[in-house]
Amino acid sequence: MILTVTLNPAIDVSYPLDELKCDTVNRVVDVTKTPGGKGLNVCRVLNDFGETVKATGCIGGESGDFIINHLPDSILSRFYKISGDTRTCIAILHEGNQTEILEKGPLLSVEEIDGFTHHFKYLLNDVDVVTLSGSLPAGMPDDYYQKLIGIANLNGKKTVLDCSGNALEAVLKGDSKPTVIKPNLEELSQLLGKEMTKDFEALKEVLQDELFEGIEWIIVSLGADGVFAKHNDTFYNVDIPKIEIVSAVGSGDSTVAGIASGLANDEDDRALLTKANVLGMLNAQEKTTGHVNMANYDKLYQSIKVKEV
């Protein structure tokens, strides 16, 4: 079983408009509301793929109830209730653009943070892999992912971390290392303080930096150009075919789902990398974020090339 952790989930609201007019009324006909957050995208894709998955995180208020009530019944909801209201994130789609209005989310108390920590320990009993995705809510220290990874490691669980900024830096500089991290080139550049390109030799060199010591897998997203990956001392380039993209939103989360599935099923390097990229591409072919159409899986799987470099 796979456990997905979304500490700062949201309700994602989409407002499509022909034109966004400022300082006046804009009327929306077609409103879409879905449970949002990187980890929730991961769990939905895992569910589509047929994996047994349970989802946790911190939720509160009517917005939190909405999230629980609008996840598929086959996903085991094991969320931790907090006093604050789960945030709402609004995307206004207009004239080919997307304007986002993102709430910060609730402020967690020390007691709530401690409560979730104990809740997390309990949830580890019957899982093999844990995914940790997205931003930390207000009140949680930057090293909180480091704490959860340490607990998972003590219990023999594999972890996949997909975050950025201070939270990622705290993990890399801490003692407890995740099994997998999945930065993109922009995030890698921020970590290293220099601009990174798709040059394989340069990527090889930086992924051997002491900053990444102790991390079994480093999987760097190159967008439409696939993936560059390091597993222990072996490097891979994953070449993906060109596809018609409907929406790339959530494709990174779908890739995390594939990584977690590969780890849970003890797949070899090539199978894990291929599955992860296929699920990311399948999500990009869908309008709905965090959804994959498995009818196209086999065809895409055969078109991906994994090369040791």
Curated annotation (Swiss-Prot):
| Record SUPFAM superfamilies | Ribokinase-like
Q: Name one GO molecular function term.
A: ATP binding
What lineage does the source organism belong to?
Answer: Bacteria, Bacillati, Bacillota, Bacilli, Lactobacillales
What is this protein's record name? Tagatose-6-phosphate kinase
Pathway note: Carbohydrate metabolism; D-tagatose 6-phosphate degradation; D-glyceraldehyde 3-phosphate and glycerone phosphate from D-tagatose 6-phosphate: step 1/2
According to the UniProt entry, where is the signal peptide? none
Q: Which family does it belong to?
A: Belongs to the carbohydrate kinase PfkB family. LacC subfamily.
State any GO CC term. cytosol
